[in-house]
């Protein structure tokens, strides 16, 4: 059972967001499942997005300073691939990729900023 059905964020530039999120989400096993002129959505099954970006050009403040999203990764290799894809496609480093024992003995994550400035993370938190 999932805890959250879906999450949607505003984006000032959907084309730029797609260039970033298409390879980043692919590294975690997701793909783009929905596209129209104002929305792109990612998930596992067509038209059933779990994460979406919506065009919002006029919003001054997008989210609060403490806001961030952590995506579940299937492996440490996927976390590293997420980080590399983010760096290659317009993301900015926010802590790199590796073990983070301050969050737990097996907490392996990558932390980046997306092109809209959101703090995003990929994490696997368990024995490998």
Regions found by a protein language model. Give the residues of each.
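Core segments of cupin and vicinal oxygen chelate
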Residues: 8-50
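Vicinal oxygen chelate
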Residues: 11-16, 71-115
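Short, contiguous alpha-helical
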Residues: 113-128
